[in-house]
């Protein structure tokens, strides 16, 4: 008798587990995306990307997840599409159990702005270019003159990193002018004088020597 009861209980338990598994599987398949939540990090300091920008990109690519089945939403495709925006440094898209797609976005950090006949763009802290925004102007050194993009992402990029790490010269230098022969002039924030740097070769040693001279 006890054995029969045990068999019946085990059978019922097995049936219950199968039913629950099937029920929740069907429920997950039927669940649709209820909301798209976007977090743009450092949005108070930088305004290159907004939530509406990202939503517009997804709609144009037919990737807007709202009201779509959660199982049909490909977060990798969403990330790939949004990374085409040159203002974005990193993005993570993921699903939540409550039927929400969340986007966490990091904007690029500009360290230099170039205005020349070759273009008007920023150089970011990773050494890549990014377009100028119509809604936000970054407070970074301005480069003008004869600036090729190759120079911008190599020598000028290294020089901008140096300025970021050197408080004295970062406070001094406001503009950089590049001549056709790649000779460089630095324009200070205060005064009418210019610093003739020459080429970017050994620029740190040149500026160290100049600072030593100014301190005499």
Task: Tell me the role of every PLM-derived stretch.
Residues 92, 175, 185:
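Short, surface-exposed charged micro-motifs
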Residues 43-84, 134-161, 198-200, 204-208, ...:
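Periplasmic/extracytosolic POTRA-like scaffold domains at the N-termini of outer-membrane
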Residues 33-35, 73, 86, 96-100, ...:
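Extracytoplasmic
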Residues 74-126:
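Structured, soluble extracytoplasmic/luminal domains of envelope-associated proteins
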Residues 40-44, 95-97, 105-109, 147, ...:
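A mature extracytoplasmic/lumenal domain signature
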Residues 104-180, 195:
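Extracytoplasmic segments of membrane-associated envelope/inner-membrane machinery
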Residues 1-69:
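N-terminal membrane-targeting segments
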Residues 66, 83-89, 164-172:
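Short secondary-structure junctions
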């Amino acid at each position: 008798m006890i054995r029969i009861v045990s068999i019946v209980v085990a059978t019922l338990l097995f049936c219950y587990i199968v039913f629950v598994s099937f029920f929740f599987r069907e429920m997950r398949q039927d669940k649709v995306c209820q909301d798209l939540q976007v977090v743009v990090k450092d949005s108070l300091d930088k305004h290159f990307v907004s939530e509406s920008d990202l939503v517009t990109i997804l709609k144009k690519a037919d990737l807007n997840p709202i009201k779509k089945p959660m199982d049909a939403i490909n977060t990798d495709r969403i990330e790939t599409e949004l990374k085409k925006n040159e203002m974005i440094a990193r993005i993570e898209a993921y699903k939540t159990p409550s039927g929400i797609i969340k986007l966490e976005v990091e904007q690029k950090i500009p360290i230099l702005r170039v205005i020349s006949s070759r273009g008007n763009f920023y150089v970011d802290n990773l050494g890549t270019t990014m377009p100028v925004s119509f809604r936000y102007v970054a407070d970074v050194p301005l480069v003008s003159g004869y600036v090729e993009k190759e120079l911008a992402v190599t020598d000028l990029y290294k020089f901008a990193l140096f300025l970021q790490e050197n408080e004295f010269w970062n406070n001094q230098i406001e503009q950089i002018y590049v001549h056709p022969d790649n000779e460089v002039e630095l324009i200070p924030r205060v005064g009418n004088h210019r610093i003739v740097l020459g080429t970017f070769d050994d620029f740190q040693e040149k500026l160290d020597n100049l600072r030593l001279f100014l301190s005499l």
